[in-house]
Amino acid sequence: TVTGILLGMQQLLQNIKNGKTIVEDVPVPTPREGQALVKVSASLVSAGTERMVVEFAEKSYLGKARSRPDLVKQTLDKAKREGVMPTVQAVFNRLDQPMALGYSTAGTIVALGKNMQGFKVGQRVACAGSGYATHAEYNVVPRNLLTPLPKNVDFESAAFTTLGAIALHGFRLAEPQLGENVAIIG
C-alpha cells in the first residue's frame, strides 16, 4: 500500500481459450455506489461448479460448442443481427478474457461506495456471486450479495453461505409437503 491505497492483489483466473488456470497479479478494484470492497479471509472451492468451468475451458472449440448449445444459439442469433465478422470477433474477444473463479467467500469490509447504509468498514460479511465473490485477495461486492456475519460464525464456515442459500432455494422450489422425505445432494 502507498498512503493507505491498495495497489495490487492476486486472483485465481481461468483462461477459457486454452484451459490454463493461473494466479495473476491484478489491480485492487474500487467500490462504486452500492458496493463494498471486502478483504477475503476464506474462499470456498465448489468442486462441482468449478470443475465444470475448468473442464469446459480445456475443451476444443468444437467441444465447447457441443457442451453449450445455448451459447451457440446466442452466437447464431447475434450473427444474424450484427453480421458474421463482428460476431466472430466478439466470440474470440470473450474467449481471450480470463474468467475469475469462485462465487462464495467471507471477509471484512475495508471500503464502501456510496449508499451502503447498514454496512461499515471493519464489518465481517459473507459474499456471494459469480464475478463478485471470487478467489482473490479483495472483491468488490454489491450490497444485495453481502450479509453480515454473527459474532460466533468464523470465516471458514461463512464461506459456505452461498452454497447453503442455493440448497435452500432448491428446497423451496421443490415445495416439499409435511411428512415427505427429501434428500439434498451436492
Model-based region annotation:
Residues G4-Q97:
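Short N-terminal strand-loop motif that marks the start
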Residues Q11, N181-V182:
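Conserved hydrophobic helix-helix packing surfaces used for dimerization/oligomerization
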Residues R32, K120-V121, P142, Q177:
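Residue-level recognition of short, solvent-exposed, well-ordered loop/turn junctions
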Residues E50, A133-V140:
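Short, Lys/Arg- and Gly-enriched loop/turn segments at beta-strand edges
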Residues P86-Q97, S104-S130:
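A glycine-/small-residue-rich N-terminal strand-loop-strand element
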Residues L101-Y103, A128, H135, L145, ...:
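A glycine-rich, Thr/Ser-enriched phosphate-binding loop motif common to dinucleotide/cofactor-binding enzymes
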